[in-house]
C-alpha cells in the first residue's frame, strides 16, 4: 500500500481535525445501526489522538469496547469520474468503516494502515459522512494479546469486567494516525518495490511496479538531491545503475527521489508517484552487522509512541523533538517497540539517518514463568498465527522501501522456551525471509539461553534483561557477573551476534541518594554503566538499546508509579542523569567501540 501523497496526478484531502465522538459502553451501536444516521449526543474528539486522556472522565480512559467517530467531508466536483480512496492510518484495534451508511471496510490490527475504495458511495459536490466504530478489546487472537476477565463474586458488581493484557504499556485506543481521502485515475500505480545494492562506486536500484491494469507504459526516473537526473528506465521492472552513487549511511543520510509515471494507451500521464530511495546494503556476517560493508554498532533505545494528552496519537512536534534528542545524546538507532510506528516517523528516520529495527506487535506472548503454557487451542492458536502472518506481511509491505529499516523483529519476549514455539516461529521466519530476503530478522528474547528453542531461525540474538532490578533488586555488585555469564552463553549456544535490546532501571526524576538506591537517578546511571563495562569486553556484542528512551504510560499497578519510569528522559522529554552519561559514552565511542 502506497502512502497517500500529492503528486502530479494524485490529490489528497486530509480529514484530520475535530471529529464527533461517542463512547458505547453497552455496545448497542452496531445492533441499533448508529451508522445509518448522524451520531447523537457526541463530544468533540481530535484525530489523530488516543481518546483516553482527552477528557476528565476516568470511565472513558479505561473504557472497554466500542467507540464511534464521525466526520463529514465534501468531495470536490473535480474528482468526478476518478477513483476515490479513504485511507486510515491506524485504528486500535478493530474497526468498521461506513460512508453514507454503507460499509466500505473492516480491519483487525491497530498499528498499520488500511484503505477503502469509496468511489461508488461518495458523491462529489455534496456533503458526505464517514462513520468509524473502533473497538479496543484484546484477546488471544489479537496482536498484542489479552483477555477479558469478568468477576463473579459478591465483592464486585454484577458483570464487572476488566481488560487484562500481558505487556507493559497502556492500551491506548482510537484513531491514532491521520485519516485521508485521495484520488487517482482508473489506471493507477498499486505498489512499488525497491531493492538496492552497491557494486564498486556504482549504486544499483532494482524496481518493480505493480499497476491496476496490464496495459499502460511505465517510465521511471531517479533524481539526486540537487534534482539532477541520475538514471532512467522503462517497463514495470528493471534495474537502474547509478554512477558514483552517494550512499545512505547511518547519521549521513543521502536520499534520491524515484519518479514513477504510468502512461495510458494514448501516451497520456495516467498516474504519477514519487518516493525517496536510499542506496545501501545490509548484511550479517559472522558476529558483525554490516551496513554498506562497514561494521555497525547499535547505540540507542527501545521507544514508545507515547506522550502527554495525545497518548499514541501522531504528533510531528514530538517526533521532531525525539529525533533532536536522539542526535543530542549521540544515538544512532531505535527499535519500534513493540509495534509498527507511524510511517511519517520512518520518513523522518530516512532523512536523519537513524537506523530502525521494525517490530511486529507480538508482545505479551508469555506469563514470565516457565510453567504456564501459551500456545494452546484457546490461547495462541492457529488463528493467532494466521493473524501474526498477516500483520508481518502488512508491515513488510508498508516499510520495505525505507532505507532506515535494517532488520525485522518478529516478537518481543515471547515464550520461546516452549516446544510449540518451534513450528510457530519457524513459519514466521520463513514468511519474513520470503517477503524480504534483503533484511536480517530477529526475535527479542526473554528466556535464558539454555531454554530458548527458536534462536537458530534468526540472524541476530536480541536480549532483554533486568539484572539488579527484577532479578536481585538492588544488588548492583552482581550486574557485571550476571550479564557477562548470560551474553557469553547466548553466543556459545548459537554463535550469532548479540544486541542488548532492553536493560535499565526505573528512576524518578529528582530522586537522589548516594550510595545509590533503587528509583534514584544515581541508581539508574550506575546500573547502566555496569552493563556497559561488560559490553565493552565482548566482541560479539554489536549493540546496546537502553530501556527506555522516555517514561511512558502503563496500566495502574503497585509496580508502576504513574507509568514506567525507565526512560532516560521524562515523559516531557527532560533529561535525567543517565542521559548525560549516555551522551558522553556514545559521543566518545565513535561509530564502533574499541573492545577491551
Swiss-Prot record:
| Residues engaged in binding D-glucuronate | 168, 412, 464, 470, 502, 547, 566
The protein's pH behavior is summarized as: Optimum pH is 5.9. Shows high activity in a broad pH range of 5.9 to 7.7.
Q: Which family does it belong to?
A: Belongs to the glycosyl hydrolase 2 family.
User: What's the short name of a Pfam family annotated to this entry?
Assistant: Glyco_hydro_2_N
Q: Name one GO biological process term.
A: glucuronoside catabolic process
Function statement: Displays beta-glucuronidase activity with the artificial substrate p-nitrophenyl-beta-D-glucuronide (PNPG). Is probably involved in the metabolism of oligosaccharides containing the 3-O-beta-D-glucopyranosyl-beta-D-glucuronide structure released from bacterial and plant acidic carbohydrates.
Q: Report keywords, A-Z.
A: Cytoplasm, Glycosidase, Hydrolase
Molecular function terms from GO: beta-galactosidase activity; beta-glucuronidase activity; carbohydrate binding
Q: What is this protein called?
A: Beta-glucuronidase
Main subcellular localisation = cytoplasm
The record's Gene Ontology cellular component field reads: cytoplasm; extracellular space
Give residue numbers for sequence motif N-K motif.
Answer: 564-566
Q: Which reaction does it catalyse?
A: a beta-D-glucuronoside + H2O = D-glucuronate + an alcohol
Q: What is known of its domains?
A: The N-K motif seems to be a discriminant that could be employed as a fingerprint to identify beta-glucuronidases from the large GH2 family of proteins.
Q: What is annotated as the active site?
A: 413, 502
Q: Where in the cell is it found?
A: Cytoplasm
Q: Which Enzyme Commission number(s) are listed?
A: 3.2.1.31
Amino acid at each position: 500500500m502506497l502512502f497517500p501523497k500529492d503528486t502530479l496526478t494524485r490529490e489528497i484531502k486530509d480529514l484530520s481535525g475535530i471529529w464527533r465522538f461517542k463512547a458505547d459502553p453497552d455496545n448497542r451501536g452496531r445492533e441499533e445501526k448508529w451508522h445509518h444516521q448522524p451520531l447523537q449526543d457526541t463530544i468533540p474528539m481530535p484525530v489523530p489522538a488516543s481518546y483516553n486522556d482527552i477528557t476528565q472522565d476516568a470511565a472513558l480512559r479505561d473504557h472497554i469496547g466500542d467507540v464511534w467517530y464521525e466526520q463529514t467531508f465534501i468531495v470536490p466536483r473535480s474528482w468526478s469520474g476518478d477513483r476515490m480512496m479513504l485511507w486510515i492510518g491506524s485504528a486500535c484495534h478493530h474497526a468498521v468503516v461506513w460512508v453514507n451508511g454503507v460499509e466500505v471496510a473492516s480491519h483487525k490490527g491497530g498499528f498499520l494502515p488500511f484503505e477503502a475504495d469509496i468511489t461508488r458511495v461518495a458523491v462529489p459536490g455534496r456533503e458526505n459522512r464517514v462513520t468509524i466504530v473502533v473497538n479496543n478489546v484484546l484477546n488471544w487472537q489479537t496482536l498484542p494479546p489479552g483477555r477479558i476477565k469478568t468477576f463473579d463474586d459478591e465483592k464486585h458488581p454484577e458483570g464487572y469486567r476488566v481488560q487484562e493484557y500481558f505487556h507493559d504499556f497502556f492500551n491506548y485506543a482510537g484513531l491514532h494516525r491521520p485519516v485521508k481521502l485521495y484520488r487517482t485515475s482508473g489506471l493507477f500505480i498499486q505498489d512499488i518495490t525497491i531493492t538496492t545494492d552497491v557494486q564498486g562506486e556504482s549504486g544499483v536500484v532494482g524496481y518493480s511496479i505493480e499497476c491496476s491494469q496490464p496495459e499502460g507504459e511505465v517510465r521511471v526516473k531517479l533524481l539526486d538531491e540537487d534534482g539532477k537526473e541520475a538514471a532512467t528506465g522503462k517497463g514495470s521492472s528493471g534495474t537502474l545503475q547509478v554512477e558514483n552513487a552517494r550512499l545512505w549511511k547511518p547519521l549521513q543520510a543521502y536520499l534520491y527521489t524515484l519518479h514513477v509515471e504510468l502512461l495510458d494507451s494514448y501516451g497520456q500521464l495516467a498516474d504519477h508517484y514519487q518516493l525517496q530511495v536510499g542506496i545501501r546494503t545490509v548484511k550479517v556476517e559472522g558476529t558483525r552487522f554490516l551496513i554498506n560493508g562497514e561494521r555497525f554498532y547499535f547505540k540507542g533505545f527501545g521507544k514508545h509512541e507515547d506522550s502527554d494528552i495525545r497518548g499514541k496519537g501522531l504528533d510531528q512536534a514530538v517526533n521532531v523533538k525525539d529525533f533532536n534528542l536522539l542526535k543530542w545524546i549521540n544515538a544512532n538507532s531505535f527499535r519500534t517497540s513493540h509495534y509498527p510506528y507511524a510511517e511519517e516517523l520512518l520518513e523522518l528516520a530516512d532523512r536523519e539517518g537513524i537506523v530502525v529495527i521494525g517490530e511486529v506487535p507480538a508482545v505479551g506472548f508469555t506469563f514470565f514463568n516457565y510453567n504456564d503454557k501459551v500456545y494452546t487451542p484457546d490461547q495462541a492458536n492457529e488463528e493467532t498465527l494466521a493473524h501474526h502472518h498477516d500483520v508481518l506481511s502488512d508491515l513488510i509491505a508498508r516499510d520495505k522501501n525505507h532505507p532506515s529499516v535494517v532488520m525485522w523483529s518478529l516478537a518481543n519476549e515471547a515464550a520461546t522456551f516452549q516446544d510449540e514455539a518451534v513450528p510457530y516461529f519457524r513459519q514466521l521466519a520463513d514468511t519474513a525471509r520470503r517477503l524480504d530476503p534483503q533484511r536480517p530478522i530477529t526475535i527479542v528474547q526473554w528466556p535464558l539461553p539454555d531454554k530458548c528453542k527458536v534462536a537458530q531461525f534468526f540472524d541476530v540474538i536480541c536480549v532483554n534483561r533486568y539484572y539488579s532490578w527484577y532479578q536481585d533488586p538492588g544488588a548492583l555488585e552482581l550486574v557485571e557477573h550476571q550479564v557477562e555469564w548470560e551474553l557469553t552463553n547466548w553466543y556459545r549456544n548459537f554463535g550469532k551476534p548479540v544486541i542488548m535490546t532492553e536493560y535499565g532501571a526505573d528512576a524518578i526524576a529528582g530522586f537522589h541518594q548516594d550510595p545509590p538506591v533503587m528509583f534514584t537517578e544515581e541508581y539508574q546511571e550506575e546500573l547502566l554503566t555496569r552493563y556497559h563495562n561488560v559490553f565493552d569486553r565482548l566482541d560479539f556484542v554489536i549493540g546496546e538499546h537502553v530501556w527506555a528512551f522516555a517514561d511512558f504510560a502503563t496500566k495502574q499497578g503497585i509496580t508502576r508509579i504513574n507509568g514506567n519510569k525507565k526512560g532516560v528522559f521524562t515523559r516531557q522529554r527532560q533529561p535525567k542523569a543517565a542521559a548525560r552519561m549516555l551522551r558522553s559514552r556514545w559521543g566518545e565511542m565513535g561509530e564502533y567501540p574499541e573492545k577491551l
